[in-house]
Design a protein with these regions (language model features):
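Extended, highly charged
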Residues: 1-286, 290-516
């Protein structure tokens, strides 16, 4: 595969390979469940990207290769962002937060290798591409799992690049899960009663699915954010059969129209979705394919859904971007004192932890109310935990401690809000309330856990005039003497690193937070 066209899937594969983060699987594998099971085990082990090059039934089809697990671990995220190995989770989020503040708009070019091969008319056949049947109970082969679905807002002319699942239901048809409260769901309404033009991008640089699966505000174009991460514009070319633009160096592009007429719908699903449970089947709108373009020797990109303890996936890794976007949104809404945000991986962002410099009573409640009012909250922020700066939001033990000793339900530290819109894929909601076609979304009752120190207590002399009992910590001078004599004690293990020494004394934190 040539890699001389700038940022694209091939340059990304080369980056992974040079960092020992790619495995080329040359032995025969089956698209029917085997790829899914291999991927599940590999992701659980934090393994490399997998490039399957010998897929049964696809030895001589238009596309013979399939890539997955290419942003499935932290090292791959560091590589994608140009960060050193060992960069911590908090630093990754901060890097993304800053990058998303500096959008780089795309530029339109005349041509690109994605049009090296053009497929039209009776030659269109989606089964020429090795889309897996990922799980035993899936309704069919899911080609749209880690792609970029491009639509345009008829009013503003702004592109939306989203990540929406799709199942092959015929040679030229893809049934799509449609949630009206999503970005492209709004576009779908604008085009009614006419079909909506759609372009689906399979395989470009992995900033594409990373951004397409992230909850940017409606006035933000994902192309701009991809450019921000790459440090250069995304080169786009015009499609021929739909009025849209796609990356000039994409591997595969499907053009078509999504019809709102229920008479054209097809059964989509079931599908084992991101919560780790099997979703249900339902009639869904269908993309009728009008044209396919692809590079020579193209590579299809896809990913495995289904998160549960011990089994994260590429979608959960996207929570780095989601956390950064949410942090920026809170700041844009005028919420002061936000010092960190983390949308947990196993919850796929349904649990959101926010660290604050608490400045007033009700600060945590303000944070939760702001989160619940954002457009992306249909999928995220079901449960919100707010903590202070002495709690490491990436440490589940620290969060457990804060939840145990700073939350008192009888004092209003737990608050419920709802029913509200929520994810239609959450199995904790009764199925009759998860009908996205009827309601536009599912239904949640949301919860805030205020795990900050209560300001309801009066300052007490024995607490040093604080509102809350002080944390037991070691005097810095004493700790320094212990560190100096550690080897002398003969304990036989290395002394604490700088991070844990600060945790022991809280010397730096005490200078900023009087309540510590």
């Amino acid at each position: 595969m040539s890699t001389n066209f700038g940022p694209d899937l091939r340059s990304w594969v080369a980056t992974l390979q040079s960092a020992d983060q790619l495995c080329r699987v040359a032995v025969p594998v089956d698209w029917d469940e085997e790829i899914g099971a291999i991927t599940r085990a590999n992701l659980s082990l934090g393994g490399p990207g997998l490039l399957f090059e010998n897929i049964l039934g696809h030895e001589k089809t238009r596309c013979t290769k399939f890539l997955t697990s290419a942003i499935g671990n932290r090292r791959q995220i560091q590589l994608m962002l140009g960060l050193p190995e060992g960069t911590g989770d908090s630093a990754i989020v901060r890097h993304l937060k800053a990058a998303f503040r500096n959008p780089v708009p795309p530029r339109v070019v005349e041509s690109g290798p994605v049009t090296q091969n053009i497929v039209e008319g009776d030659d269109i056949d989606l089964f020429q591409f090795p889309a897996p049947k990922w799980h035993a109970n899936d309704g069919g082969r899911y080609i749209d799992t880690f792609c970029g679905v491009v639509t345009e807002d008829k009013v503003t002319g702004r592109d939306n690049v989203g990540l929406y699942r799709g199942q092959i239901v015929d040679r030229d048809k893809i049934a799509k899960l449609m949630v009206p409260s999503q970005g492209w769901g709004g576009h779908f309404e604008e085009y009614k009663p006419d079909p909506m033009p759609v372009a689906i991008v399979y395989g470009w640089h992995d900033v594409l699915p990373f951004c397409a699966g992230s909850p940017f505000a409606r006035d933000v174009c994902e192309w701009d954010m991809m450019g921000a991460l790459l440090g250069q514009p995304v080169d786009l070319i015009a499609c021929e059969t739909v009025p849209l633009h796609v990356p000039a160096t994409a591997e595969i592009v499907v053009e078509g129209y999504l019809d709102p007429d229920p008479a054209t719908f097809a059964l989509e699903g079931p599908f084992a979705e991101y919560p780790g449970f099997l979703g249900s089947a339902a009639p869904a709108p269908v993309v009728r394919v009008t044209r396919i373009t692809h590079r020579d020797d193209p590579v299809l990109r896809g990913t495995l859904e289904g998160i549960r303890p011990g089994f994260f996936n590429e979608d959960s890794i996207t929570n780095f971007a989601r956390s950064a976007i949410t942090w920026n949104m809170l700041e844009d809404l005028g919420i002061n004192g936000i010092t960190a945000v983390w949308m947990t991986e196993v919850s796929n962002g349904q649990d959101t932890v926010v660290q604050i410099h608490k400045a007033y009573r009700g600060h945590a409640q303000q944070v939760a109310a702001a989160l619940w009012g954002t457009g992306g909250s249909v999928w995220f922020h079901k449960n919100v935990i707010v903590v202070e700066e002495d709690i490491d939001i990436h440490d589940p033990v620290a969060l457990d401690w804060a939840m145990t000793y700073r939350v008192n339900a009888g004092l209003g530290d737990i608050a419920f809000y709802g029913p509200t819109m929520g994810s239609p894929l959450d199995p904790s909601t009764p199925p009759e309330k998860n009908d996205a076609a009827k309601y536009g979304a599912g239904e949640w009752t949301r919860v805030l856990f205020d795990a900050t120190r209560s300001w309801e207590f009066e300052p007490r002399p024995e607490w040093g005039g604080r509102h809350f009992p002080p944390i037991d910590k070691v005097d810095p001078a004493l700790e320094a003497r212990i560190a100096a004599r550690w080897e002398e004690y003969g304990i036989g293990i290395p002394y604490l690193d700088d991070e844990r020494r600060e945790l022991l004394t809280m010397e730096q934190l005490s200078r900023r937070l009087k309540d510590v």
